[in-house]
């Protein structure tokens, strides 16, 4: 059974703050299955969802093309307004051996704009995480297309965000551990062209966090990314709803007219049983966009998605349903896509029993009522 948040009345402070209804009940619609490689030893997770004016949704996600082999590709399906889907196809793969991205290619975030490279102007950019064989850390790349239905995307050859340390190879963090690097990008258009709000996860000797930067990819010969800043984390609560939480692996979307930014994030810590690398719950939070970019203010929860809502013990790697520019149609009642997984004793880390083979994509929507 879904749990609810009760939001009390708050006074209007400025035109960007909509007055909340007294004792508004917030819940979510019954989650619906969207996609999974069912009956196969394959996973589908980390979605990026773009809603078109006619109701069509372009869904990009991470998957493995071969049974039992955990090598990430980025796949695409188109979900028609009547609910029918196109066949899943791999549209971005690891690079050639020896390249910076020759191992995994995952975590897509797709945006519309105007991006010029080698005298060609592209309409869409796909930001992604990748890494190479022989190292543990991740970095961020970008690829381009003029068609959301494209069978393949044109990769920019180098990383656009590199690891945070200058030395070659992995960064040791003690206890035999290694730094995760940078990845899990989320991009929002600021001008409908090449200027973007870029957020991504950092995992290094300084800890785990999400940072944001303003980027300009209008011309890839002279692209720029500002010095990243750690996002505001005030107001975020851990699984106990009391302890302060930290952020990683989150998706963002904005409503510029309302001056709001919305985030869907994992709630820490992760459970201790297998798979102990996936979160059980997700949360949707919001704050003023102007506060976010000025490093002030605090997050307010909209809804926390738990196993009671979904029927699955793990709920992770989520996205908000956005338009092509990363904007929300209704920031107060967003639709979202998320990944589920089974847990022990239903799965175990071996062969065809891995938890990964139960990664499927579902969707739901926040609903408010008086």
Where are these regions (language model features)?
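N-terminal Sec signal peptide cleavage junction
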Residues: 1-12
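Beta-rich carbohydrate-recognition and catalytic domains
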Residues: 11-46, 50-103, 113-178, 189-244, ...
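Conserved beta-strand position repeated once per blade in WD40 beta-propeller domains
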Residues: 46-48, 107-109, 184-186, 249-251, ...
